[in-house]
């Protein structure tokens, strides 16, 4: 037997046991993922509340299945290549401790989907709910807002929600990070809002155009360096 044959034989034996061989259905993989996440001590605070919800989301996303329809697929058998994809995702979450949003490359605020990656903080803001109501009662008529600013825009998610909440507004979205603005530009383009949202690279107001604003919103990173040391790995 050649060295190459020996390596191939070892690879075949690896697949005779373990999750790739023993876990067959979506239900099997869901149970396995929940156990792995719990044993790894994963933190859940980026839109999904526990190991089960995150396992459902990651498995359905990996298999390109509807995120709101688990039941019809629970006992579906998963081909070998897709099992490998699921195992890779589970390991990224449980071993590498990557947040689910960075694994899938997306995050949701309400019905709005946004691209995210490690260049930006994962969207998670109570401002989203306020913007759904046009920031009532502080703003009586959303259509009267014609100029608004999102300071520390990050992925651009709040600027995009502002554009929908205030249909007559032009939005200035500001961030100190060009990497973050690059992500924001992709999200803005995905919603066709390039004509209404202007991205500005600025340290605070330093490079912001001199103009008046009807509405200014800011949801900056608010964790101190000391607090960062005690945060979960995610």
Residue ranges and their predicted role:
Residues 47-49, 141-144, 194:
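Short helix-terminating capping/connector loops at secondary-structure junctions
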Residues 41-48, 137-139, 206-207:
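Short helix-to-loop capping/linker segments positioned immediately adjacent to catalytic or ligand/cofactor-binding
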Residues 3-110:
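N-terminal auxiliary segments of SAM/dcSAM-dependent transferases
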Residues 73-74, 80, 84-167, 174-186, ...:
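SAM-dependent Rossmann-like transferase core, predominantly class I methyltransferases
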Residues 36, 40, 134-138, 191:
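Solvent-exposed amphipathic alpha-helical surface segments
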Residues 168-170, 174-234:
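S-adenosylmethionine
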Residues 64, 120-121, 222, 229:
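Active-site/binding-pocket entry motifs
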Residues 61, 65, 165, 190:
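Active-site catalytic microenvironments for nucleophilic, acid-base chemistry
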């Amino acid at each position: 037997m050649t060295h190459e044959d020996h390596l191939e034989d070892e690879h075949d034996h690896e697949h005779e046991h373990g999750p790739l061989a023993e876990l067959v259905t979506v239900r099997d993989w869901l149970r396995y993922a929940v156990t792995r996440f719990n044993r790894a001590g994963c933190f859940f605070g980026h839109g999904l509340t526990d190991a089960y919800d995150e396992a459902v989301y990651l498995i359905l996303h990996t298999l390109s299945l509807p995120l709101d329809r688990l039941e019809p697929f629970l006992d579906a058998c998963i081909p070998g290549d897709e099992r490998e994809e699921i195992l890779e995702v589970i390991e990224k979450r449980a071993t590498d401790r990557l947040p689910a949003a960075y694994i899938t490359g997306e995050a949701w605020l309400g019905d709005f989907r946004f691209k995210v990656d490690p260049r930006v903080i994962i969207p998670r803001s109570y401002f989203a709910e306020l913007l759904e109501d046009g920031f009532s009662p502080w703003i009586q008529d959303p259509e009267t807002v014609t100029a608004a600013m999102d300071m520390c825009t990050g992925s651009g998610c709040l600027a995009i929600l502002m554009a929908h909440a205030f249909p007559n507004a032009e939005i200035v979205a500001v961030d100190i990070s060009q990497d973050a603005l690059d992500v924001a530009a992709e999200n803005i383009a995905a919603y066709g809002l390039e004509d209404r949202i202007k991205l500005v690279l600025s340290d605070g107001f330093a490079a912001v155009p001199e103009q008046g604003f009807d509405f200014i919103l800011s949801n900056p990173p608010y964790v101190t360096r000391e607090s960062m040391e005690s945060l979960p790995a995610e």
